[in-house]
């Protein structure tokens, strides 16, 4: 307090921080879910069982038609190096550079018709997953090609597969390492290539190892002479690659330079192989190694992976012992026929071999020449937890798994929208019409007699981000179908939801078993009681004293209507914020600074109670100083007062500040301007507070 004369005055001014009632909007985002999830590809007669990919069946997200498409597909993955060929390094070999620690050794598929599985699972997924997680590849953590082969070979000992089947299996069902499913290279005894390994929780274990997405470089991304609408060459063209720095190579080389390995198909029995020669001004480190200069025909369809490229390797395509235009550059590929073939299991494929028509003058003429690299694929693996811990477990017994179909349907209780997944597998082998007449039926364990299969399916394949709390937002149905009435029944032993978080199991069969033959059975959650639980949401996320906070109770399970109670717990004692009421949210100002806990108690109509707790920190808002712009003033002078405040809520502005002027026991209140300051002009002298 100051005493002032008639013209000079002192002051003591009080600034008070007011509160603002500005509740934020609560926005609920409906989860997008996968719709029917099936995989069906036609066998095109590839002799190694590697089937062509029909580009017309790929979604837009699975088609990569340019460097820009690849960049978008890669997202937050490996850093991109550029979008044009001149900006790319002249060579990259992911089997020998710093990424080589993720490469599995050259494998040997032997007599197993599973080249697509060795390409997609053994090489591509092992390398990509381990690189994503930063885990070096060892002989024990390689992912098994037999796991995906047995699930995709249609029950035929010479059954083929292709990339999309393998990638879909890994995306939805996961993968197992060779410790669980050895990478055998003989199809005998036949059970080893028919066994689905549906036992001992292996299917649930596999769900830890999945991929996020896959994409195919459509031919226009690297072969401009192709028309992907009809998936065939355009007769008038077919020579897109004319030099080592040709822009038509940019998409593939960008991916490889970013540390990727790429799956692809080729006709390996039609390769025209020669040896790399030496010449001045070229890379002579690989002289004497095998290089493919062209693909003569359509014999021996085979899946492999591209691991690198080198712009400075010379392939004497026309055999004239001179370096001619179009002869520079080659991709390095890894095969799955052991180290005895090629260059210790690797090969070089000349860039020119990608052309339908060679760019090299005097090149050998092949009447049915084919591109040496085709249907190139890439996969994306994110270092995250893929499994939701909420699964459908189903145990079946049959000698004819080909007749089995299983569907799971989630029906949103709010809007009755349906999300259906056809579990792949088991699937009916009639999906692969070309094998129907020659397939031998087997049990889930690959035997010719009836046997059990214990299978798991992650429910996030149906509803993304599902958990045990949100399971009750949907009505669930599981439909099991036995297609043929042939005297070979299907036994339904278990159908249940399993929650690994709590260890809970919710039986849809009521402890019974069922047998069907040529019919179906639907099981629902109508008689299943899921856990009654609650969660708490507090808004805003950063809380300050004097600020109004919205507290929302989120309830799962139980039977409506509900009663809600809100409390604040601090230092071992509780303060009632709102006694039991019908409102699932309340608005309160929390003036006790420090660490505390919001406690919400919910009762359902049956008297069941659940409690949810939310730890929070309330930041103390405090005015630490009030500074005038003048140390002395006279009556009639304007003085600007500026407050210094710590931990001020972001939503607060000048309307939250109030200033009080007191003189001779009489007080007058004023509001601040928008930037929290107060401008005061005294009309008389004296002592003022």
Where are each of the predicted segments found?
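A short beta-strand segment in extracellular, disulfide-stabilized domains
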Residues: 547-555, 637-647
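Short glycine/proline-centered coil/turn motifs in the loop regions
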Residues: 556-560, 646-653
